[in-house]
Amino acid sequence: RPSFCNLPVKPGPCNGFFSAFYYSQKTNKCHSFTYGGCRGNANRFSTIEECRRTCVG
């Protein structure tokens, strides 16, 4: 699994409402969150499938 999968979820400071997914090292699962649209990190995926494929394996 890439190291960025272990980054904490980061919605960012902007006020957008974008559906996204992140990997949780604690649960070994992908979860949904609302991304604000700016200054997040690499642990953010457009689909849960992409998150699972990249981080869960």
Curated annotation (Swiss-Prot):
CDD domains: Kunitz_dendrotoxin
Chief localisation class: secreted
Residues in BPTI/Kunitz inhibitor domain copies: 5-55
Compartment annotation: Secreted
Tissue specificity: Expressed by the venom gland.
SUPFAM superfamilies found in the cross-reference section: BPTI-like
Gene Ontology MF term list: serine-type endopeptidase inhibitor activity; toxin activity
Cellular component annotations (GO), alphabetically ordered: extracellular space
Disulfide bridges in this chain: 5-55, 14-38, 30-51
Assigned keywords, A-Z: Disulfide bond, G-protein coupled receptor impairing toxin, Secreted, Toxin
InterPro entries: Kunitz_BPTI (IPR002223), Kunitz_BPTI_sf (IPR036880), Prtase_inh_Kunz-CS (IPR020901), TFPI/VKTCI-like (IPR050098)
UniProt function note: Interacts with vasopressin V2 receptor (V2R/AVPR2), probably in a selective manner. Inhibits vasopressin binding human V2R in the nanomolar range (Ki=8.16 nM), and also moderately inhibits vasopressin-induced cAMP production (IC(50)=224 nM). In vivo, intraperitoneal injection of this protein into rats increases diuresis by 5.5-fold, without any loss of electrolytes.
Family affiliation: Belongs to the venom Kunitz-type family.
Classification via PANTHER family: BOOPHILIN-H2, KUNITZ-TYPE PROTEASE INHIBITOR-RELATED
Entry comment, domain topic: Exploits its two major loops and engages more positions in its interaction with V2R. The pharmacophore defined by numerous amino acids positioned in loop 1 (9 to 18) and loop 2 (34, 39 and 44) may be at the origin of the absolute selectivity of this protein for V2R.
Protein name according to UniProt: Mambaquaretin-2
